[in-house]
């Protein structure tokens, strides 16, 4: 990667100037040979294995540092590589991190430089496994900052010394030997080094997080207590030994129980001297040091207190001399100490009044726990006092403005037995992981904003859901459940643990949580961790019992009283903060602090468990690579721009790739450098999506693009050949796809449609025993099965299928409802999703978990276990499924496609019996048959039913022996086109339909809506007995019915919209005389209104404006009615043919201007009772309304003429009213007398007035006209292009 020089931060910068002194690249023979890649974002293949291989190669070469962008990866070498000397440190001063090899000094230099250059707070987050080198990295950063901010002032030097002295002091009190690390930090630490206006360290601040105080009283085998106990017991002076009774560590239970008092690589005596020196540098007085060691002695002697049983089985002190000496060290009364250890005081309350006080004796186990609690409390408070005392010393100088923070915190822990300490540690790591991703993206965005780069925010897994699972209060998280359990059973730890286990049942629906008897699992970002419930509530209390508090408050030692301040009002009813509350507060404060600083990151890796400088354990390192999420970090970095370079450097590197910039290896371009960059990118055919040009830099998105540029010189023509091959393959694939579509159409013509055949099979299964809904009999109704598209890759159905854990092929899927019964309550109809696979039937429910929608399987039914399905003989949609040998109640479900569901079940299991009768029988409880009755009720919703008290009330449906209607002929919509390459279909906008449709042509698209909704109008005149909703339209135009919610019949197949009137929509199949050709009748327009001029478009032109039709007498009020019209009775030849055979008639004389209302007035052509929604506007036939807005979905926003009410109505139910203009219009002389039809209609020039009058004279003329119209229609369809097959594929 080329070098990037720093520049002054500016929002905008002028374009790069012309550069003419570009030199040829030269080979640096003195550079160390690079092994692997120094930045993991340049790896060709991103996987955990490839990252591990690269780290191994560099480790074996002595290169322990690697970058991921600005993140540093450090592998512990377990040896001195000589890379931390002053000479090495000097080479990194003032150098960009890309100018020198990866190093922790480069991170420190970048932090210090950014602090000075941008005056922004800096921080470094160091994370990794225990023993991976986190503390060492923190030391090196402090070493570099102290050296880089050199000053000759004594006060500044003293602050530097104190900052460096915090390391040995806090290591002694906060680190211990573990199985994995001889100097493992057992607490989190955030050190802020604060700088004055001259960027010199003038102050500091240390924040402590979660000391592992449990280690004070017990360790596992071959581990040790905190270092200070061994340092003090081995190196204490004679004065301390005489005054405090200090013995060797083998004499104390707390330091010898684990069997490890000495470590080969640790010199406790030397470390003790370093600790004393650090205390002196920080400024601890001798008196303060004496008190610290006094309490350390007391803690060691407390561990030697043992108990034995008395005659009553209670605990008593085995050796009172030890308690006497402990009382001497703590300066408390010995009798009170003994009483506090073996007894517990309990006080009862009666409301707001105090009750009786009892002294309850403890057994040996309880007394031992009290003893350990006292020792842990003293050490924890002592450690916090030391941190506070260090902070007091570090605040010596004023004037601190900016800071550099160093976070050294424990890593993610997964042990065989994990308890409260591990969940706290892992919770903090979850918070750090969250801020790591957020701040990484933030820094990326800032650079893109500086260079004015457009980019899309990176999508990544946000572990906020896991953090909320642990820390949330509403709904309660795990810590909140712990607090509630403690409050419920405060005195009894076992009872509190049981209460906590019960509360964990609340989290079972969370996908990141699992409950396993006495354990629970949290799915952290770094892996699943199993936690033990036992003992968690007791550790969460983090509170001394009342007797110990009174004991410590009675001390005469002022220092002990200082570290145990008065707890306040003892009678307060407020719950004291628990350990969980403290860690949540500390973690959130840490996140706030880090969010206010510019972050840097160091991820440390431990190469082996043997601490050998030569071993590299691939399996162990691979585990850490996954644990630290390095692959995710690389992908986040690469999701933005993996490579960025200044224009000059980019041109210098790649000018050979453009013939306009080079000739025979020489740079020949004389223009602007930015133009040269554009030429290179253009001539190399780099997609514009793969790069962006900023103010001074070019950004390459992926490393593969960069590598392609590097290899383009040799492979340019190969790439061009590949593009030609790719285009040819695309052409061949298009031909194959076209052939497949033709073959599919031919197969359907020969063998029929399998979906329609399945529908017919389903109708036979019903056997005429059940009343049918009108929508079930439509010709376009076919059994497609997977209505939710569960088998597709990206769809809502696929999402539900994935969440439900279904891997099989889906045969049938639909949304519906299921009856949910509760004891003592009315049954509820809950929305459900039904999915049928070849082996199981799933009923899936959805719930909100942490404000996120999730799906879960409520029922999983083996298809082979279904004995029968039960239905009523009415038109309702309820189905009862009887399952044998089931421990759950049988499901009673409601779905519009019940017949199709039963058909698929019957196909999968032929033994299933279909019971149809007046009742539905199913098992409401296992082994208990329950019957649901059905009855006719005309007050039921038109499109649904009413379920109440085990009774289904529904309207009368179609007879069960009704035959299925024939499928209408399929044709392409006149305003629809299909893009061959993309398959995108443009259905057009309703406003455009008026401009492009021919006024004389009744398109077949008027006879049915979108096939997905299944609402069609039959072409068979004998099947049409009643009027249908008439869509509104302009003069001389026809509108296609809306695609969505055009009528109530459409809504019948939409489970989410139940608007409309079923009776009106179903009436469209009865009266043949009402609508002879199934086309929407056109409302007659007054002659005084001008005809809108259609927009020019290719293809046939619409005919001229027609004149008034002849008739017996003029109509006083021309109103649109669903009746037989003269216009619809006349055969209409094709517009092109008509243009060739006869000239158009002359237009009528221009009408005088007429007053027009401010908003169009429409009239209801049919009754629209609505579905009960407050957003709908129920109408009666003949009601007049204003229409303020029409939506493409098929709904119009209507308003009463007096403005008293407003709501939505189906556009197909209303027609534009002419009565509103009747008083404003003036009579206009027509060019021909009116006929006797009673309705004045406009003719678009396709037929003569005489032909129209003759057609209206007799009923036989109507039949002949209809036949001629159908014949003309069929003739036109034969001449249409082959694209009609595309629309046929979209039908039911």
Swiss-Prot record:
Gene3D superfamilies, per database record: 1.10.10.820, 1.20.5.4820, 1.20.58.530, Kinesin motor domain, Myosin VI head, motor domain, U50 subdomain, SH3 Domains
Chain residue ranges for the region called Disordered: 956-991, 1017-1180, 1227-1258
Composition bias type Polar residues, residue spans: 1062-1081
Sequence ranges assigned to domain TH1 in this UniProt record: 770-960
Residues the record lists as Phosphoserine modifications: 356
Keyword Cytoplasm: yes
Source domain of life: Eukaryota
Residue ranges of domain SH3 in the record: 1157-1219
Domain IQ: 718-738, 739-764
Annotated ATP binding sites: 128-135
Residue ranges constituting the Myosin motor domain according to the UniProt record: 35-714
Bias type Pro residues, positions: 1087-1121, 1142-1155
Keyword vocabulary terms for this entry: Actin-binding, ATP-binding, Cytoplasm, Cytoskeleton, Hydrolase, Motor protein, Myosin, Nucleotide-binding, Phosphoprotein, Repeat, SH3 domain
Compositional bias of kind Low complexity: 1240-1258
Subcellular location: Cytoplasm, Cytoskeleton, Actin patch
Keyword Ribosomal protein included in the entry's annotation: no
GO biological process: actin cortical patch assembly; actin cortical patch localization; actin filament organization; endocytosis; mitotic cytokinesis
GO molecular function, one term: Arp2/3 complex binding
Cellular component aspect of the GO annotation: actin cortical patch; actin cytoskeleton; cell cortex of cell tip; cell tip; cytoplasm; mating projection tip; medial cortex; myosin I complex
Residue span of region Actin-binding: 403-485
PTM per Swiss-Prot/TrEMBL: Phosphorylation of the TEDS site (Ser-356) is required for the polarization of the actin cytoskeleton. Phosphorylation probably activates the myosin-I ATPase activity.
Free-text comment on this protein's domains from its UniProt entry: The myosin motor domain displays actin-stimulated ATPase activity and generates a mechanochemical force.
Summary of the function given for this chain in its UniProt record: Type-I myosin implicated in the organization of the actin cytoskeleton. Required for proper actin cytoskeleton polarization. At the cell cortex, assembles in patch-like structures together with proteins from the actin-polymerizing machinery and promotes actin assembly. Functions as actin nucleation-promoting factor (NPF) for the Arp2/3 complex.
Family, as annotated: Belongs to the TRAFAC class myosin-kinesin ATPase superfamily. Myosin family.
PANTHER family: MYOSIN (PTHR13140), MYOSIN-3-RELATED (PTHR13140:SF837)
Protein name per its UniProtKB record: Myosin-1
Source organism of the structure: Eremothecium gossypii (strain ATCC 10895 / CBS 109.51 / FGSC 9923 / NRRL Y-1056) (Yeast)
